């Protein structure tokens, strides 16, 4: 590659490619944030449910969700122990308070991940705005030179 400056058209092409790459990365991060939000909501529900169970009496009849908005009647046999997923498809029985602490720690980690992804997304959006402005400048420059059909996103 020579030291010769690039033409505005080539600069624009490179900027458009970079913009599209940032756009794809931003879309991926938004999808990841959606998954994180669903996980956070599930953790919040589990923490709330364990809290509610701790106030229930053993033998108390309750409705247990079985999916698709359906419930089954059940009697609580133990309010102080729950079964929690510890990862890798493995679930273990834990004291309710210990399970709540474990779930709160997961929730905290999820919140931190969400914060980092939002920060990365903000940086990408800033870079996309910078590229957009550069493309607009190049487009004006090309129009002054008398030949552009426009390429700003």
Curated annotation (Swiss-Prot):
For the keyword Flavoprotein, the answer is: no
User: What GO MF annotations does this protein's record show?
Assistant: unfolded protein binding
Spell out the GO cellular component terms annotated for this protein, sorted alphabetically and separated by semicolons. cytoplasm; prefoldin complex
User: What are the disulphide bonds in this sequence?
Assistant: none
> Which keywords belong to this entry?
Chaperone, Cytoplasm
* Localization (cell): Cytoplasm
* Biological processes annotated in GO: protein folding
User: What does the similarity note say?
Assistant: Belongs to the prefoldin subunit alpha family.
Task: Please explain the role this protein plays, according to its UniProt record.
Answer: Molecular chaperone capable of stabilizing a range of proteins. Seems to fulfill an ATP-independent, HSP70-like function in archaeal de novo protein folding.
The entry describes its oligomerization and partners as: Heterohexamer of two alpha and four beta subunits.
Q: What is this protein called?
A: Prefoldin subunit alpha
Species per Swiss-Prot/TrEMBL record: Methanothrix thermoacetophila (strain DSM 6194 / JCM 14653 / NBRC 101360 / PT)
UniProt lineage:
Archaea, Methanobacteriati, Methanobacteriota, Stenosarchaea group, Methanomicrobia
């Amino acid at each position: 590659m020579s030291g010769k400056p690039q033409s505005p058209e080539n600069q624009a092409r490179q900027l458009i490619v970079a913009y599209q790459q940032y756009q794809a990365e931003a879309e991926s991060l938004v999808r990841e944030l959606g998954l994180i939000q669903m996980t956070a909501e599930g953790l919040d529900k589990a923490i709330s449910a364990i809290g509610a169970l701790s106030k229930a009496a053993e033998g108390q009849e309750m409705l247990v969700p079985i999916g698709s908005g359906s419930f089954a009647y059940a009697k609580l046999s133990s309010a102080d122990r729950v079964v929690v997923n510890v990862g890798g498809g493995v679930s273990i029985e834990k004291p309710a308070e210990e399970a709540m602490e474990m779930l709160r720690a997961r929730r905290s980690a999820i919140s931190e991940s969400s914060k980092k992804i939002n920060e990365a997304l903000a940086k990408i959006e800033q870079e996309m705005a910078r590229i957009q402005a550069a493309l607009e400048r190049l487009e004006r420059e090309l129009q002054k030179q008398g030949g552009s059909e426009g390429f700003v996103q």
